[in-house]
């Protein structure tokens, strides 16, 4: 059976519970057509690069699907009809990823931002303060530069 990665964007004013209900509806469509949804990832509400149907943010959801093309086509047809779905994209893949997607790994990495350098010593350039690093000698007296056209 063909394998697909499917991402859809739901309007920002839809609640997370309503997005879960939509996912369950689409899961039912796929299962009725003889397929299965292997993995569901909710990436949360994210800003869009540009406005889509007057929305600046959207709920992002990833579905890893194993289904015949007819079942997938029916799910996509229902998404086109739904006013809550802004956009969707389906990509056929050779195999489905078992580990979390790059978006989920990025979220995990962002959760660790509050960590500091640990037991490593503070580097001089950590604060990007610039200033004298001590690696160059004195430039000495320099003649005054003349800007503005006066000779």
UniProtKB/Swiss-Prot annotation:
UniProt GO cellular component terms: cytosolic small ribosomal subunit
Keyword Phosphoprotein in record: no
Comp. bias intervals (Basic and acidic residues): 105-151
GO molecular function: small ribosomal subunit rRNA binding; structural constituent of ribosome
Keywords, comma-separated and alphabetical: Ribonucleoprotein, Ribosomal protein, RNA-binding, rRNA-binding
Region listing for Disordered, in residue ranges: 97-151
One of the GO biological process terms: translation
Keyword RNA-binding: yes
Entry's family note: Belongs to the bacterial ribosomal protein bS6 family.
HAMAP family per UniProt: Ribosomal_bS6
Function: Binds together with bS18 to 16S ribosomal RNA.
The protein's name in its UniProt record: Small ribosomal subunit protein bS6
Gene this chain is encoded by: rpsF
